[in-house]
């Protein structure tokens, strides 16, 4: 709702049974509203990356909603895991915020090229085809790249030769949030409860504050989910 068809602010909605998933959780309503689809996408990507506690992980587009959700999910289970994020340009204010959220280091991404020679065991690629070839150059041997996002505004990867581009015996996978199933949703909420994952939204607005909520989202000043609460 809100994308394929309107009605995401409705007090009551009529949905197909196939889009209704029962869950068991201790989260509040505001916290629960902050989970889908962002944490579902991050959780599926995390599973496909097969994270190990000894890994060094890169998140391209570290300030994105999925990037921050991924950070919180993996750090909740592996607090000492080294997670590095990339952001466009050298933004000291954004870097400070992201380090405060839990990233271990932030790397500048200049025109989809990382300003580092460091390589990583796992890479969550949220920029997409615009930067993925550069990610190929930063993956360790037998590492895994999960191509999940398309934030770079490029939808397809031209001239891709798996034999030549994946030089380090690396693995390339993906996760599509549209492939929703009840089992994975149950796993996600069980994981959040078991590891006490912080999923609280960054801001909560009342329905009467809907204009301010949209102004805040469109300002790109936030670093997390914004929830509109109907009393």
Describe the residue ranges of each PLM region.
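Glycine-rich phosphate/adenylate-binding loop and adjacent beta-alpha elements
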Residues: 1-21, 49
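Mid-domain Rossmann-like dinucleotide-binding core that forms the NAD(H)/NADP(H) cofactor-binding site
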Residues: 32-111
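C-terminal hydrophobic helical "lid"/dimerization subdomain
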Residues: 44, 180-231
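Short conserved AdoMet
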Residues: 52, 78, 140, 167, ...
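A short acidic, Gly/Pro-enriched loop at the edge of an enzyme's catalytic core
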Residues: 114-123
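Short, glycine/polar-rich helix-capping loops at beta-to-alpha or helix-loop-helix junctions
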Residues: 8-9, 89-97, 156-161
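Glycine-rich phosphate-binding loop and adjacent beta-alpha segment
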Residues: 4, 130-194, 230-231
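N-terminal Rossmann-like NAD(P) cofactor-binding module of classical short-chain dehydrogenase/reductase
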Residues: 123-124, 146
């Amino acid at each position: 709702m809100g994308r394929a068809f309107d009605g995401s602010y409705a007090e009551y909605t009529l949905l197909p049974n196939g889009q209704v998933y029962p869950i068991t959780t201790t989260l509040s309503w505001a916290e629960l509203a902050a989970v889908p689809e962002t944490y579902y996408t991050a959780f599926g990507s995390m599973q496909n990356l097969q994270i190990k506690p000894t890994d060094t992980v890169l998140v391209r587009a570290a300030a994105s909603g999925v990037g921050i959700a991924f950070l919180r999910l993996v750090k909740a289970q592996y607090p000492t895991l080294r997670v590095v994020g990339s952001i466009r340009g050298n933004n000291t204010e954004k870097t400070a915020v992201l380090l405060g959220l839990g990233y271990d280091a932030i790397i500048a991404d200049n025109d989809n090229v990382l300003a580092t020679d460091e390589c990583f065991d796992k890479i969550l690629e949220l920029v997409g085809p615009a930067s993925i070839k550069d990610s190929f150059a930063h993956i360790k041997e037998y590492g895994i790249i999960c191509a999940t996002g398309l934030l770079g505004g490029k939808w397809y990867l031209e001239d891709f030769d798996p034999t030549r581009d994946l030089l380090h015996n690396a693995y390339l996978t993906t996760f599509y949030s549209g492939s929703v199933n009840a089992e994975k949703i149950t796993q996600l909420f069980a994981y959040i409860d078991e590891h006490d994952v912080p999923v609280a939204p960054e801001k909560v607005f009342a329905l009467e504050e809907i204009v301010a909520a949209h102004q805040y989202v469109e300002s790109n000043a936030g670093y997390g989910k914004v929830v509109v609460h109907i009393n």
